[in-house]
Amino acid sequence: LRLIEKRKSVEGVENIDTLLASERSPNIPTASVDVVLLVDAYHEFSFPRDVMTGVVKGLKSSGRVVLVEYRGEDNNVPIKRLHKMTQHQAKKEMSAVGLQWLRTDDYLPQQHVMVLSKL
């Protein structure tokens, strides 16, 4: 987080906030964010439902979640299975916390970039 804050300062970026999450909460104020970007992180959460419920609570009504995960459907991606996620799995788990899948962008060679919104 310090590196991001330093780079924001150097480049004069004002529209990015960093927050230190806990194991069970993203610590996002209610209805305060436009986008939550999770890169190769979701599958590591010890309490994914708790964290994602907090993410949804923190999204503005038009907010989005961008979930980037290694393609679980692709056996050619040289990552252990526990560090991958299928689109089907992501859609199921995200819908359980109040998110709906909008699209998947596949411009990265080994990862899905899944875009979701509040239901």
PLM feature spans:
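A short acidic, Gly/Pro-enriched loop at the edge of an enzyme's catalytic core
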Residues: 24-36
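Class I SAM-dependent methyltransferase SAM/SAH-binding core
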Residues: 1-26
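Conserved class I S-adenosyl-L-methionine
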Residues: 1, 64-91
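A short glycine-rich, Lys/Arg-flanked "PGG" loop and its adjoining helix->strand segment in the class I
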Residues: 49-64
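Core SAM-dependent methyltransferase catalytic element
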Residues: 97-119
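A short His-aromatic
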Residues: 27, 41-44
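A short beta-strand submotif of the Rossmann-like class I SAM-dependent methyltransferase core
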Residues: 34-39, 51
